[in-house]
């Protein structure tokens, strides 16, 4: 597996970002060693906002994700650096405009194994608004169980692992799982085929923007009142 290390620098009012990829074994020990290397580089060179470890590196190491403030300007967000913290920050702000549903609405959601506990804790913030989202971590049998990111989860694995444990009225699918106009998974299965196999409404939701995610939930509730 590749872990992402994002590097960014600014000069003459222009900001550029480069990405450095290095192969690390998918163990907590190697991920921890990589994070330590990055921290030492920052300390030794006085470059606190120059190099960052991706969220996946911290998750693999079993370490707490950096805070929102520690993620800098999120210049490497496309490489997974600070992705969850920005989503969380925007999600919490968006809650201020979320109307309380007139009755309890329950949905299911799927994710990669590594981020599932964080998403589950975050979604509990929706309970006062009469919205319950059950998070189902999906082990990646298609690419190998050392692959734990959400964007590489396939429909076949969702069917095998979740078919008998979905209690909500719809299944939320993070948009990063989908390709080809947001309807095809990496294993070639379409969202309508997944819906037929699970006998569930499939609803695409944003996986990287907390504001958009809340809007997606509002639209789901309004269209299925």
Residue ranges and their predicted role:
Residues 1:
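Active-site-proximal cofactor/substrate-binding loop regions of enzyme domains
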Residues 4-225:
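Auxiliary Fe-S-binding modules of radical SAM enzymes
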């Amino acid at each position: 597996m590749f872990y992402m290390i994002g590097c960014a620098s600014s000069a003459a009012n222009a900001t550029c970002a480069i990405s450095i990829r290095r192969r690390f074994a998918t163990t907590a020990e190697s991920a921890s060693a990589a994070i330590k290397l990055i921290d030492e580089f920052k300390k030794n060179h006085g470059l606190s906002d120059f190099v960052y470890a991706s969220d996946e590196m911290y998750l693999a190491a079993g370490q707490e994700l950096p805070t929102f403030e520690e993620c800098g300007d999120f210049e490497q967000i496309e490489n997974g650096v600070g992705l969850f913290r920005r989503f969380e920050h925007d999600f919490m702000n968006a809650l201020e405009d979320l109307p309380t549903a007139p009755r309890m609405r329950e949905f299911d959601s799927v994710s990669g194994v590594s981020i599932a506990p964080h998403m589950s804790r975050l979604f509990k913030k929706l309970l006062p608004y009469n919205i319950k989202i059950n998070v189902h971590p999906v082990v990646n049998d298609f690419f190998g169980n050392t692959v734990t990111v959400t964007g590489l989860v396939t429909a076949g694995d969702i069917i095998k692992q979740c078919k008998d444990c979905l209690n909500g009225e719809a299944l939320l699918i993070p948009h990063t799982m989908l390709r080809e106009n947001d309807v095809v998974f990496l294993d070639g299965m379409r969202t309508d085929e997944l819906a037929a196999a699970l006998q569930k409404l499939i609803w695409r939701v944003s996986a990287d923007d907390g504001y958009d995610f809340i809007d997606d939930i509002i639209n789901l509730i309004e269209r299925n009142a």
